From Swiss-Prot:
The lineage of its organism: Eukaryota, Metazoa, Chordata, Craniata, Vertebrata. It comes from Mus musculus. Residues 95-212 are annotated as: Disordered. Gene3D superfamilies: Homeodomain-like. Its main location: nucleus. PANTHER family: HOMEOBOX PROTEIN HOX-C12, HOMEOBOX PROTEIN HOX-D12-RELATED. The keyword Transcription applies. This is Homeobox protein Hox-C12. Residues 212-271 bind DNA. GO terms for cellular component: nucleus. The gene is Hoxc12. Pfam families: Homeodomain (PF00046). It is found in: Nucleus. One of its GO terms (molecular function) is DNA-binding transcription factor activity, RNA polymerase II-specific. Belongs to the Abd-B homeobox family. Residues 159-173 have a biased composition (Low complexity).
Amino acid sequence: MGEHNLLNPGFVGPLVNIHTGDTFYFPNFRASGAQLPGLPSLSYPRRDNVCSLPWPSAEPCNGYPQPYLGSPVSLNPPFGRTCELARVEDSKGYYREPCAEGGGGGLKREERGREPGAGPGAALLQLEPSGPPALGFKYDYTASGGGGDGSTGPPHDPPSCQSLESDSSSSLLNEGNKSASAGDPGSLVSPLNPGGGLSASGAPWYPIHSRSRKKRKPYSKLQLAELEGEFLVNEFITRQRRRELSDRLNLSDQQVKIWFQNRRMKKKRLLLREQALSFF
């Protein structure tokens, strides 16, 4: 039997929670690791290139991202790219180095904005995703210059609302000037000046919604004589008498009613004027 000490596998196994079915004892080996004189010593040549690395040992090579150092390189790059940078959270202070294929596409947005001479056009060029077109990126301003055939064109910014408004107003003004200079007979006519065209202050595209005033139609002498005679008989005409007058004088019922109202007001003004003159 072997020596009973703490280095014996029979005692060490249960202590480290390793249960083995069979326990082997080697009486020729001691606990100190020294061999007996009867066993021959085996020599193994040392090989330095067993665990040699393909890169220099001075460069750090680890698979975990280190803060404020170079980013890790994935061993299996997707989509056939030569260099794929791992995505890290923005809350951590990791800086990613530019990729060889993307042309600086891996830089952070803050670092792009700090570069000298970076304008709105440059920001659009830099923010373009460097992935393949099959992924279907939403915003691609650099390749939107051409049509649907995939031809590339110069980058351009989308037009703003102010530019659209200015273009529309200028086009309307130009059309109005052309129509005014040509003297189109079908143009809008002002109700105040039917014979002439538009006024200088009027806009050609602005529709005139003002209601034209109805032309005044004066009463004839025969109608006035009949109405005056009826007023002398009765200032307040009845409905039946009003209908008879309207039918006989070829007037509407409303016209007869309004004429009697105006005639009563005229009589009242004359009475007030006579009273005012009598005091002096």
